[in-house]
């Protein structure tokens, strides 16, 4: 269809109003039209004032796209004409529609940047009149945003950066002049709407210029923090004025406050602001004065003022950013090193942040500020520890600060009534409590064992179930820090509290899951105690195991998880209660949930593994018979999803029996008759392989008495359903039994050939199978190289298949194939030699763009191995260099972007590099970018720089 105005208007109408299928076609056609050369002409026709807003917006968007993507289509002599048209369009749409005006301003910004921002002031002069002031602000605001988002070549970016650095001083001065009206006297009446709007626009513009990140951060004089303090004070004053008159200001007052605080955050943190501690302290003191007024407003829990909470959220975000950027100055101020008024103000700001963390009410029902501070506590404790650096003690003042924080976290962990929470609120609260758990560990890094003392005190002082549950939640968060081998009394006291709650589930139903979490989390600590303390710990652990078992009917998932952890880490009490645990595991009512049942089976396995064999074997037999019966029943049923639950239960039990190979062997022997039925059903083959894999992992060399049956099951299952789990079983058979069992040869050959036949039709369709196959072959080549003789008849086909897998899009299969070919090059070059030229060609195709660039590292390892290989059967002069040269010889290969100079540089660097994978990866990376036409772009510069940093 021709790109006429009429056709384009019709397509836009279909896109906005048609059916889904028609809209998709219209979108495709309209997108193609944006790239057409005719677009430079039809955009102006579609932008006429008589056209609809949707059509005007499409035209403005097309203009922006053309300037970004098709700038090379504009001859230099047409730049002036395009500039005039852009300015006329921007001025013509000064009164809207707003979305069209904004898009035209962005287009003008892109035009300016495509010319390296030269003559910036001259280009924008027509917008400098009072009536066009808002347009000028809009264009100035989007220029830095467009600069950050645009893809441009390195030279053009450097040119733009220099021009923007030069212009930024004037722009920020202009914004400051606009914001300084906040210093006027507003004691009798509030600022009018026009003034408020001007503050919003000026703050947005200044923030945009300050927020150019990284290497592109503006480095003019106005970007040093001391010189930005005047701007910061103007922004703070604007917020203070608007907050003072909040009841009489327009609805845009909060938006203006948020814009000012966003700009203030940028001014406080960008441009190496942390190099100026004195200015930072002054800034934090000013922020404290502002926050003191806003944050001290009482928070009404019954009727939350969400408009005010939006302002508080913006202010807290700003304060947190300033404190995180200037943490060192803040630490010194709190410790009294900076004793002037500014230092006191910074210390006051920290107290206000603690108060915000302890905001009354429940998150997210009554407030949304307390979740903004968690990153500050991490940064603060990290700076305190770095400054101490093991050479000096932490200042005692931090004990008080982090004690306050810990108490606040305990309070904020309290959960509201479930009826008050929507599903979304429940998820927010779950994430919030996880953040609280992390912050508790920050407290531990400063307070150490005192954390348990503070938490125990909070539990003792609690007068509601919710408060006690919150203390237990914090106690559970500290479990990873429990001192193994030591017995702090407050820790034991809290664990006793958790035990009492778990032992009386009806009395504390809401606290029960948290109490059970405590029992399980401290299981490893209980198991670490010895001597007199160990005796007390063993008794306590036994009580914990009994309590977890008794709580199963009331909180099955939490109790089962706690029981599993306790049985795994506290062997003596688990062994003593093994019979009870096995009985509970067989209880159908408790075991209905599959996840819970797996936890119970794992707990039973750990308890049996800790017991004497004569006592454990009969108990295990009852479990094994039950599982075998379930597997048999599922194998005889017609349900397609059958068997998975029983098989996963077998896996859980077998994994827990790993410390007792004799019991693992008993279990496998009992399961073998049922397992023999599974290869007859394709959907049960993979569950069978999972059981065999975990059985071999638990038994290791002790699998030999049953290896014949395992091998037969593996071959039978793999013939019916080749899958990755089956190849994992083959790998374990070879590793554990290859030297003692002659049948390993047949099992390996049968399964490898079956996998190769499956992949030969379409390797990309089964990436997981390809990954597993070449992971198996890599393990055989490296650990059991003689086993390659077993598959020698198909080795050539496997090599050719691996060459195809090198360029599949799924990274797992490609990476495994490259790894095996590299190992083969080091150990069996004669097997790889016939395919080497084709492999070199495939590698070039892949580097050139036939596969994702994420696979370049695996290809680099392969090229390095090929270059190091000793090609004993190669003709004179043959090797990686000749094969790569032959592959690169055709013009335009692998892409038209790869010039002869690029190819020669790549070839030379690859051939000479035989030792450093890092240097070879840089060469491959650079050639890959060249093949994609990206070699001189900003993206290429950042990519190569990132590789250098990682190296």
Task: Please name every model-derived segment.
Residues 1-49, 160-163, 167-170, 174-181, ...:
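N-terminal "cap/leader" segments of large eukaryotic alpha-helical scaffolds
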Residues 4-8, 35-43, 75-87, 101, ...:
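Core helices of alpha-solenoid repeat scaffolds
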Residues 11-18, 42-51, 86-97, 123-136, ...:
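Helix-loop junctions that connect tandem helical modules in alpha-solenoid scaffolds
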Residues 72-189, 351, 355, 359-477, ...:
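Alpha-helical repeat/alpha-solenoid scaffolds of the HEAT/ARM/MIF4G superfamily
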Residues 82, 100, 316-363, 367-393, ...:
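Extended alpha-helical scaffolding segments
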Residues 178-185, 201, 205, 209-219, ...:
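Alpha-solenoid helical-repeat scaffolds
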């Amino acid at each position: 269809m021709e790109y006429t105005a009429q056709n384009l208007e019709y397509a836009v109408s279909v896109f906005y109003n048609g059916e889904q299928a028609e809209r998709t076609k219209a979108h495709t056609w309209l997108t193609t039209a944006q790239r057409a050369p005719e677009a430079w002409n039809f955009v102006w026709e579609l932008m006429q004032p008589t056209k609809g807003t949707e059509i005007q917006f499409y035209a403005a968007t097309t203009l922006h796209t053309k300037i970004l993507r098709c700038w090379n289509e504009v001859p230099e002599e047409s730049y002036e004409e395009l500039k005039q048209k852009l300015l006329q369009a921007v001025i013509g749409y000064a009164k809207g529609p707003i979305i069209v005006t904004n898009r035209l301003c962005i287009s003008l910004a892109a035009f300016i940047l495509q010319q390296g921002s030269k003559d910036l002031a001259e280009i924008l002069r027509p917008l400098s009149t009072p009536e066009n002031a808002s347009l000028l602000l809009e264009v100035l605001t989007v220029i830095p945003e467009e600069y950050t988002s645009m893809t441009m070549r390195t030279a053009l970016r450097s040119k733009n950066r220099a021009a923007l650095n030069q212009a930024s001083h004037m722009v920020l001065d202009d914004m400051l002049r606009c914001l300084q009206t906040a210093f006027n006297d507003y004691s009798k009446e509030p600022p009018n709407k026009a003034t408020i709007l001007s503050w919003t626009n000026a703050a947005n513009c200044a923030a945009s210029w300050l927020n150019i990140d990284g290497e592109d951060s503006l480095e003019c004089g106005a970007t040093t923090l001391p010189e930005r303090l005047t701007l910061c004070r103007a922004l703070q004053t604007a917020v203070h004025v608007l907050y003072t008159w909040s009841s009489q200001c327009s609805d845009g007052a909060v938006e203006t406050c948020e814009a000012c605080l966003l700009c203030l955050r940028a001014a406080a943190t960008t441009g190496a602001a942390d190099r100026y501690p004195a200015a930072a302290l002054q800034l934090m003191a000013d922020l404290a004065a502002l926050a003191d007024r806003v944050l001290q407003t009482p928070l009404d829990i019954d009727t939350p003022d969400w408009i005010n909470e939006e302002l508080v959220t913006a202010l807290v975000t700003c304060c947190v950013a300033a404190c995180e950027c200037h943490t060192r100055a803040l630490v010194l101020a709190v410790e009294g090193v900076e004793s002037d008024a500014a230092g006191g103000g910074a210390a006051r700001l920290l107290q206000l942040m603690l108060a915000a963390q302890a905001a009354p009410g429940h998150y997210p029902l009554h407030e949304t500020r307390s979740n903004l501070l968690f990153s500050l506590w991490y940064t603060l404790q990290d700076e305190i520890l770095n400054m101490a650096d093991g050479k000096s003690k932490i200042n005692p003042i931090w004990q008080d600060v982090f004690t306050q924080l810990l108490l606040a976290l305990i309070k904020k962990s309290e959960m509201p009534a479930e009826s008050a929470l929507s599903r979304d609120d429940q998820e927010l609260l779950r994430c919030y409590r996880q953040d609280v758990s992390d912050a508790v560990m920050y407290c531990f890094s400063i307070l150490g064992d005192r954390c348990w003392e503070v938490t125990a005190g909070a539990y003792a002082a609690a007068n509601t179930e919710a408060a006690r549950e919150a203390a237990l939640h914090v106690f559970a968060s500290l479990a990873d820090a429990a001192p193994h081998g030591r017995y702090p009394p407050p820790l034991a006291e809290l664990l006793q509290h958790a035990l009492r709650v778990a032992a009386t589930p009806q009395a504390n139903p809401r606290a029960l899951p948290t109490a059970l979490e405590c029992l399980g989390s401290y299981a490893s600590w209980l198991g670490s105690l010895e001597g007199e303390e160990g005796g007390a710990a063993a008794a306590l652990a036994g009580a914990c195991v009994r309590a977890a078992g008794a709580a199963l009917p009331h909180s099955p998932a939490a109790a089962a998880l706690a029981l599993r952890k306790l049985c795994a880490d506290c062997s003596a009490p688990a062994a003593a209660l093994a019979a009870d645990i096995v009985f509970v595991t067989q209880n159908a009512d408790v075991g209905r949930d599959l996840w819970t049942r797996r936890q119970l089976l794992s707990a039973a396995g750990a308890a049996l593994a800790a017991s004497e064999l004569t006592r454990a074997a009969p108990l295990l037999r009852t479990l094994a018979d039950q599982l075998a019966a379930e597997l048999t029943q599922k194998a005889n049923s017609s349900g397609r999803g059958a068997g998975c639950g029983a098989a996963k239960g077998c896996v859980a039990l077998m994994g827990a029996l790993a410390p007792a190979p004799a019991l693992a062997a008993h279990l496998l022997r009992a399961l073998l008759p049922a397992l023999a039925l599974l290869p007859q059903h394709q959907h049960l083959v993979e569950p069978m392989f999972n059981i065999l894999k975990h059985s071999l992992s638990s038994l290791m060399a002790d699998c030999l008495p049953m290896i014949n049956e395992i091998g037969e099951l593996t071959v039978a299952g793999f013939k019916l359903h080749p899958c990755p789990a089956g190849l994992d079983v083959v790998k374990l058979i070879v590793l554990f039994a290859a030297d003692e069992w002659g049948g390993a040869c047949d099992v390996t050959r049968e399964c490898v050939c079956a996998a190769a036949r499956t992949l030969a039709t379409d390797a990309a369709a089964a990436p997981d199978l390809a990954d597993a196959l070449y992971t198996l072959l890599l393990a055989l080549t490296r650990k059991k190289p003689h086993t390659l003789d077993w598959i020698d008849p198909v080795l050539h086909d496997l090599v050719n298949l691996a060459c195809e897998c090198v360029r599949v899009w799924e990274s797992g299969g490609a990476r495994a194939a490259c790894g095996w070919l590299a190992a083969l090059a080091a150990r069996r070059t004669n097997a790889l030699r016939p395919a080497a030229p084709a492999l070199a060609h495939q590698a070039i195709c892949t580097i050139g763009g036939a596969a994702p660039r994420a696979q370049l590292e695996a290809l680099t390892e392969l090229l390095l191995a090929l270059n190091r290989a000793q090609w004993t059967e190669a003709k004179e002069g043959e090797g990686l260099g000749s094969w790569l040269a032959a592959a690169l010889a055709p013009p335009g290969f692998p892409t038209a972007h790869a010039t002869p100079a690029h190819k020669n540089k790549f070839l030379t660097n690859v051939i000479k590099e035989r030792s450093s994978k890092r240097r070879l990866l840089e060469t491959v990376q650079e050639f890959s970018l060249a093949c994609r036409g990206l070699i001189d772009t900003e993206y290429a510069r950042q990519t190569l720089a990132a590789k250098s940093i990682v190296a």
